[in-house]
Design a protein with these regions (language model features):
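Metal-dependent amide/peptide-bond hydrolase catalytic core
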Residues: 1-151
Length: 151
């Protein structure tokens, strides 16, 4: 009997690499990079990364980013996040079970140029091409990115 938890983990593992880059084909194609005005804004923007690290009990950001590069990642790069995952027996004690289902909630933070409907389609195609046609994708909500004026 297949283990649904492992199946889901293997599928999720294809979505993002160890450098935090989303690996879905064509995911980055429509992104409009920050212009010079936006980059100038990042340079001047006050962001206390050390306080964020301390508040979260960690000693560095992903890829050891800091300064303008960190602010650019926070504001102008999309993300893929696993918000929650559930499978099998998680009660007290132990049981030898092979999970028949696995469920996770993932979310994508999109940036200027990206379209929520297109990203869902790209995710489905990505999973299908890698043999994960059995993984169901349910869209609960989706919003296109909002771009605020830096002035």
């Amino acid at each position: 009997m297949p283990n649904a938890a492992w199946r889901l983990i293997w599928a999720l593992n294809t979505i993002k690499d160890e450098n935090d880059r989303i690996t879905i084909d064509h995911f980055y194609d429509d992104i409009i990079p920050p212009d010079q005005e936006e980059m100038d804004f990042l340079e001047q923007m006050n962001y206390d990364g050390q306080s964020v690290l301390k508040a979260n009990g960690i000693d560095h950001f992903i890829n050891n980013l800091s300064g303008t590069a960190l602010k650019e990642k926070l504001l102008y790069e999309p993300t893929a996040n696993i918000a929650g995952i559930e499978s099998g027996y998680t009660g007290k004690g132990s049981k030898t079970v092979i999970p028949s289902y696995a469920f996770c909630k993932i979310d994508f933070r999109l940036v200027k140029g990206q379209d929520a409907e297109r990203v869902v389609k790209l995710l489905r195609e990505h999973l299908d091409r890698r043999g994960f046609t059995d993984i169901e994708v349910i869209k609960y909500s989706g919003k296109n990115p909002y771009h605020a004026d830096t002035k």
